[in-house]
């Protein structure tokens, strides 16, 4: 099912799309024209752009269910927290064609975390695939909670698994790592959860490595 947003009949489209979403097997799809701000140092859309697309798609997907971070903190005292990203970059893209982004929730045995799969294509060719892991956090108690606590649709997951390596279990401390630089968090870095917004982590991650690192791998 393909849903495109426009300026006309917005309420009618929303009512129709919400009915489709709540019926299950919902795969969100939309087109986006890349912008200069999303380009890497070489001028093409690559790591930075795709990771930002992943975040945009994942949050927009939750908004489609009516369960985005714009509303659930006030309604339930709960927020989404994205904890892991994995991306496979197939090829970089330019600015001549829009990218098509598909997002869906993968079926899992556990409800403690949610996995959103994302596929990006450009001009009919696969550009990147990825998976985002998120969890729901009770903002007052500070512990994890389940999707049922925000009345999330039980049939939201799609029986379609992305062919991508599983997440790596990360260490709980910084032993064996080197400090490369420090960053002071300011007001514009924070989000509704009073934590650093995920949008900032993309640049922080990329700046942890020098230019030679990327030249050898891209």
Predicted segments with their positions:
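Hot-dog-fold acyl-thioester-processing enzymes
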Residues: 14-82, 129-131, 138-217
